[in-house]
Swiss-Prot record:
Catalytic activity as recorded in UniProt: L-seryl-[protein] + ATP = O-phospho-L-seryl-[protein] + ADP + H(+); L-threonyl-[protein] + ATP = O-phospho-L-threonyl-[protein] + ADP + H(+)
Protein name: Hormonally up-regulated neu tumor-associated kinase homolog A
PROSITE patterns: PROTEIN_KINASE_ATP (PS00107), PROTEIN_KINASE_DOM (PS50011), PROTEIN_KINASE_ST (PS00108)
Region (Disordered): 406-475, 499-518, 580-640, 655-679
Signal peptide: none
Family assignment from sequence similarity: Belongs to the protein kinase superfamily. CAMK Ser/Thr protein kinase family. SNF1 subfamily.
Molecular functions (GO terms): ATP binding; protein serine kinase activity; protein serine/threonine kinase activity
Residue ranges occupied by any Protein kinase domain in the UniProt entry: 55-313
Gene3D superfamilies from the UniProt entry: Transferase(Phosphotransferase) domain 1
Compositional bias ranges of the Polar residues kind: 440-453, 582-597, 621-631
Biased composition (Low complexity): 604-620
């Protein structure tokens, strides 16, 4: 069983042994939806003949002397498995088959290794036994040899090394396979060896290596001479079989063949070392190692540890020593994300899940854990699991991936770099769907228009790189954050636009320069940004997941502003807060950056008259913008605007032209004489000398 792919707990693992369940939040999800959910199309498209338990029985993959192997689909996880189907009638008639079936289940529950197939579940019906194992999509190694005629030496070295590692693990556990052949070697999705079929294996842990076996087992072509001679044998019979498999990989044939077939003649060829000719392209080290494995005398034949230390086998594997795999998963290696998902979402008892996994007992609980964990591993590999050095638990790879996507692979950072290379202003408007906010939200939302100069419009020029860097010293696409007080903080508020687009359809709009934008005074910019900041504040945080319903199509909100200079603040201090002009609203005495907004509502009788004073065709724009845009009367419009989410603070590239003959919004609003005591006021006379 593979190691854990994710970890969702920070508590001590010893608490799990006591059966204590970790605290779980109601809204917490432990696995991504693509892992925890199974689509109906997956179940519908799987061709199957019947269903047994939680498995759909599909096409036949192979057929042996004792059973048939079919492809299956686990309906809980949507993962494919291999199912060995054994007929009960045949098993009961032959006690040897029944004995081998019981032995295979017992041995595979004892063993856990990456090059040995994992037994997941055992089912029994009225007519059949079902052994559920992990599926190896790479197929049989014999098919690969048939296609290529023979394998290259470096490829054969890889497979032989993996086979020896698996056999060494078996021998350390006291298990002798006795039936190692090409047909029992499968390939997984990563082109690695998987050893199957333990029907003829025997457990030497009970008898010990000092009392070897005496039964004749295995295929004669792969069997050691002592097996054919019905002599007592030990675990070195597997070493001989590895030599036969190595010869078959390198040549595509068997080392010892006789015509017509005779066990006595075959045995005599083995004893006489009458091996079929070897290809001349093989290296001397490979030939020497192969002859040592096919030594007919068991006393001269190397054991599995000596074979693993051979120089040819470890070529190109320097520094990769023998790694021992425990036959039981340790508690700290459990995938806590999968365990929590099973106990909280699938209804399994937490202590039962832990006990089944630690004991490696084949049942449906183990199958669910193994398949979900493998599914999570594939998900992390496909998403290019990052290498993050932070305070997150090193096993919590899913949460590391989410944090990496937000901090390292943000589209805004890549977009800003591209714009800087092209020398264009870094403006990127996106339309996002708005949510119908409650009245309390609308009352707390505020769009603040700022005063502007009464000077005529001048030709707009693009700000230089030094000017762009002076805007707070941060990228305009700096990440928007939520402070502890619930307010949104950002330094990218130069252009704002909020419109109601088509549902869930963000659109990218091309930038069109407007002649109504004013030039920022570079020489006075350092003093202005110390006293003035054009920002918008949202007094309550908005949960973006709750923004599902869109506003009515007849609502349209826009806020337009000129580029401003931002004072270099700490990220925690860049809170969106409103700034108003209270004492004097005359644009001749105070110079503000130009900002305006329009509110179009078909349900309001005055909505057709609303327009944007910054429009090129606006009368106020043609008359040197004589409207009082800095008036605090616009505070009345706060109740009409919904809460602003993070994705709604967007930069404007298009200025929508309003119909001619419309009056600005502030001319049809009554004056507001009393302001909320929570707003900070300042005297406009402090701005003297700056304009």
């Amino acid at each position: 069983m593979p190691a854990a792919a994710g970890d969702g707990l920070s508590e001590s693992p010893s608490r799990f042994l006591a059966g204590e369940k970790p605290p779980v939040h109601l809204e917490e999800t432990f696995l991504p939806a693509c892992i925890s959910n199974v689509s109906r199309e997956t179940l519908r498209n799987f061709q199957h003949t019947k269903r047994v338990g939680s498995y759909l029985i599909g096409r036949k993959l192979g057929e042996g002397s004792f059973a048939k192997v079919r492809e299956g689909l686990h309906v809980v996880t949507g993962e494919k498995v291999a199912i060995k189907v054994i007929d009960k009638k045949k098993a009961k008639k032959d006690t040897y088959v029944t004995k081998n079936l019981r032995r295979e289940g017992q041995i595979q529950q004892m063993i856990r290794h990456p090059n040995i197939t994992q037994l997941l579940d055992i089912l029994e019906t009225e007519n059949s036994y079902y052994l559920v194992m992990e599926l190896c999509p790479g197929g049989n190694l014999m098919h690969k040899i048939y296609e290529k005629k023979r394998l290259e030496e470096h490829e054969a070295r890889k497979y032989i090394r993996q086979l020896i590692l698996a056999v060494e693990h078996l021998h350390r556990a006291g298990v002798v396979h006795r039936d190692l052949k090409i047909e029992n070697l499968l390939l997984d999705e990563n082109n690695n060896i998987k050893l199957i079929d333990f029907g003829l294996s025997n457990c030497a842990g009970i008898l010990g290596y000092s009392d070897p076996f005496s039964t004749q087992c295995g295929s004669p072509a792969y069997a050691a001479p002592e097996l054919l001679a019905r002599k007592k044998y030990g675990p070195k019979v597997d070493v001989w079989s590895i030599g036969v498999n190595m010869y078959a990989m390198l040549t595509g044939t068997l080392p010892f063949t006789v015509e017509p077939f005779s066990l006595r003649a075959l045995y005599q060829k083995m004893v006489d070392k009458d091996m079929n000719p070897l290809p001349t392209h093989l290296s001397p080290a490979a030939i020497s190692f192969l002859r040592s494995l096919l030594e007919p005398d068991p006393l001269k034949r190397p054991n599995i540890q000596q074979a693993l230390a051979n120089r040819w086998l470890n070529d190109n594997y320097h520094g990769k020593g023998l790694h021992t795999y425990p036959n039981r998963i340790h508690l700290e290696d459990l995938s806590q994300s999968v365990v929590l998902h099973m106990s909280e979402k699938l209804g399994y008892k937490h202590s039962d899940v832990i006990n089944v996994i630690l004991s490696n007992r084949a049942c449906h609980t183990l199958a669910v854990y193994f398949l979900l964990n493998r599914k999570l591993e594939h998900y992390l590999v496909n998403m290019r699991k990052p290498d993050i050095n932070d305070n997150v638990c090193h096993k919590n790879q899913f949460h590391q991936l989410e944090k990496y996507k937000m901090n390292k692979n943000s589209y805004e950072e890549r977009r800003s770099k591209d714009l800087e290379k092209r020398g264009e202003p870094q403006q990127r408007p996106i339309q996002r769907k708005l949510d119908k906010c409650s009245p309390s939200h609308r009352q707390n939302a505020c769009l603040t228009p700022q005063g502007h100069s009464n000077k005529g419009p001048v030709k707009e020029r693009r700000s230089s790189k030094s000017e762009r860097e002076s805007f707070g010293g941060l990228s305009p696409f700096h990440e928007v954050r939520i402070t502890k007080t619930g307010c949104m903080t950002s330094c990218s508020l130069e252009y704002l636009e909020m419109q109601s687009p088509d549902p869930r359809t963000p659109k990218i709009m091309r930038r069109q320069d407007s002649h109504s934008q004013e030039t920022v005074n570079v020489n006075m910019g350092s003093r202005i940004r110390e006293t003035h900041l054009n920002v918008v504040r949202s007094f309550e945080s908005v949960n973006r997941e709750d923004q599902i319903e869109s506003l009515s199509p007849n609502h349209q909100y826009r806020v337009i502003g000129s580029p401003v200079s931002f004072s270099p603040r700490h990220s925690s201090e860049r809170t969106l807060s409103p700034i108003f002009q209270f004492d004097n609203t005359s644009p001749s005495k105070s110079h503000f950056n130009q900002a305006s907004f329009t509110y179009d509502d078909k349900s309001s009788p005055s909505s057709p008259e609303s327009m944007s004073p910054t429009s090129p065709h606006s009368p106020s724009c043609n008359n040197n913008i004589s409207g009082n845009l800095g008036s605090p009367n616009c505070v009345r419009s706060r109740g009409r605007f919904p809460m602003m989410g993070i994705g709604q603070m967007l930069r404007k590239r298009n200025q929508v032209v309003s119909p001619k003959g419309e009056k600005p919004l502030e001319t049809r609003m009554p004056p507001l004489h009393q302001m909320s005591p929570g707003y900070a006021s300042f005297n406009s006379s402090d701005m003297n000398g700056f304009c």
